Amino acid sequence: NWYMPSYRQEIERVREEIEDKMREVLLKMSGFLTIGNGKNDGEVLQVLKEKLNEAREYVRLEAENHLTKEVTYDYQYFEMRRDQSKLLEIMATNLNEFRWDGEEMAILSEMFKQTAQQLAEQNTASQLIDEIEDLLEQFRERPLPQTRCEFEKRAQLYQLLRDLKRFVQLKVDFFQTYGVHYFKKVGEKE
């Protein structure tokens, strides 16, 4: 029996499902920031984790049957998404502690929404990282908090923004290492 089944369709399907779940989590976080409080039950994050495990299994099966550069790309892609999902879990936990409103919350909410809207395999995310850097700089230039409570809230916001930056930076780094070569190769096929 020389036929070796391909799991390419399953890999592509689960890739889309993972990106959809990540968008859903980011949009929920944006909503929590808009409202000023929120409780994340972690259900979507759990489904995301299951999808990442499913992807890992399909890539393993594909590697057993067809060891190609595409399989290496897939493996690294899902590892990057796994690292991002860990950051989403941290951010969700931190958001559960959030009870604040203010201009910064609206700005941060919009950044989470923008990140969700731009989340895609082929997006380099370099423009998004620049926007987050600008936002961090704007937060640094704001007047210092006057009370301990304001200080703690500002620190939470700043930490959340830094975690979002790390989330996006993982994609930027991945694309610089793997995406440029992979999408160039795919483009040459057409």
Segments predicted by a language model, with ranges:
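Soluble C-terminal extramembrane regulatory/interaction domains of multi-pass membrane proteins
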Residues: V14, K21-N37, V47, T72-E190
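Non-transmembrane accessory domains of multi-pass membrane transporters/channels
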Residues: W2-D74
